[in-house]
Amino acid sequence: MLLCQISDLHIKSRGENAYRVVDTAESLRRCVAHIGSLPTAPDAIVITGDLVEGGHADEYALLRELLAPLPLPVYVIPGNHDERSAMRQAFADQPWMAQGGERIEYVIDAHPLRIVALDTVIPRRGGGQLAAESMAWLDATLAQAPATPTVVIMHHPPFATGIGHMDQIGLANGEILEPVIARHPQVERVLCGHLHRSIQKRFGGSIASTCPSPAHQVQLDLRTGAPQLFVMEPPGYQLHLWTPDGGLVSHTVAIGDFDGPYPFD
């Protein structure tokens, strides 16, 4: 199975740029076209939060329009820029959206790789938090299929990254997730967003990772007190290839017009 992950789209109202600089709609158009041109088509896409910038209905409508050229299942979770009720309405035609209660949490059993979605959002806050009820649900859900390879998807990564201003709006209680993941070795990866960069950490006997944005990236500055900046580094997304013999292998894909490809001989 080939699973595509995109994250932190930050779609604005039609014709508006994010932070007055970033044409996020055009960025997503290029990303969708790039995914559509892959020599091997993904089997599904997960979008790990911050689908839109302001949580408005018209932003979600534009998002659905931009994703429409992709003829494959798309599964989404909220980020801190999303608004749950507007997001539910925008994806009301998707059966998985009806699984959760207050939070947008669900499980997908339609693929060789099981997908379990967690909601880390605190409304109107940049940082996130895991609910005790979510941890109980996750533990029980993972226990139902101990032999099925699984990815857990969530917006805020459950670890500090060293990028101070992002860690300040990180996951407040990520440590409560680690023993749950450790109890279920079928979890191949915890796939996250929020950081607008590709970052990995060993976590609960598995790997937790973040995905770059198809739009703008967070400036990599590990100094204490570094300013809050973004940079127009090459946009990207990730491909996660699952095979029974090889397990889960992840690739970060850059979006752009680059020279080549050239033969090695």
Place the predicted regions along the sequence by residue.
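Active-site environment of divalent metal-dependent phosphoester hydrolases
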Residues: 11-15, 53-58, 80-88, 123-126, ...
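Extended active-site neighborhood of metal-dependent phosphoesterases/phosphodiesterases
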Residues: 57-144, 176, 182-186, 212, ...
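His/acidic metal-ligating clusters that form di-metal
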Residues: 30-44, 127-207, 238-239, 246-248, ...
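Active-site-proximal beta-strand elements of phosphoester/diester hydrolases
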Residues: 1-13, 112-122, 151-153, 206-212, ...
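N-terminal active-site segment of His-dependent metallophosphoesterases
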Residues: 1-62
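Binuclear metal-dependent phosphoesterase catalytic core
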Residues: 22, 180, 202-265
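Short glycine-enriched, charge-decorated loop/helix-capping segments at active-site entrances
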Residues: 17-23, 124, 163-170, 224-226
